[in-house]
Amino acid sequence: SQKQDKRIIKSHYDNKNDLFSWFLGSKMIYTSCYFKSIDESLEDAQENKINLIAQKMQLKEDDELLDIGCGWGTLVAHLAKHYGVNTTGVTIAQAGAEWATRQIREYGVEDRAKVWTIDYRDIPTDKKYNKITCLEMAEHVGIKYFKKFMKQCYDLLEDDGIFYLQIAGLRERSNLLQKKNREDLVWGLFMNEYIFSGADASMPLNWDLQRLEKVGFEVHSVENIGNHY
């Protein structure tokens, strides 16, 4: 529910910008980086990640991009400045939205980038975007509402648009309680308790792909970037 999500986000993210900056660095990117070599710094790998997204999204100037679950707004600000994209970020984390707004101002892209502090369920439907990104936010939606959320993303996307989804999950296992599979079970429980409070990252890749295709998406490519964590 929206009430539950606000409670979880407030306890996990709000008023903790200093804490997150200690291990996320100046770019404040919470999702996986992308290391081209083991000698790269965290900031280099974070920038690699953004540029990889831009490449996969086939971004061009004046694209209209919606980032659902924009965190501290780094992707929104970076793509607006370096790719000339018109970006809109969505988050319910007040502290993150304030950081993002300040970052947009520092990047000098107030005319191209903005952040809405609203629940993803309340994203206006009167406008469509030709590019949509969702980086490790769908886990917070949960299994029950995942397909409905994917349908929402599909409906917000232009007919020839591109949707970039990054999502965490477990490997396909018939019985997680078996001794040989308990590592995945423990990983999932740890993530839910300490990393993504209230989130569900328990489903295998084929589960995600099936639901993407059922709402109308055509899957163009899949890349496993788990080792970059």
Please describe what each predicted stretch is.
Residues 147-159:
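A short glycine-rich, Lys/Arg-flanked "PGG" loop and its adjoining helix->strand segment in the class I
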Residues 169-229:
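Substrate-binding/catalytic lobe of Class I Rossmann-like enzymes that use SAM or dcSAM, i.e.
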Residues 160-168:
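Conserved beta-strand signature within the Rossmann-like core of class I S-adenosyl-L-methionine
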Residues 72-83:
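Conserved SAM-binding loop of SAM-dependent methyltransferases across substrates and taxa
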Residues 1-22:
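N-terminal auxiliary segments of SAM/dcSAM-dependent transferases
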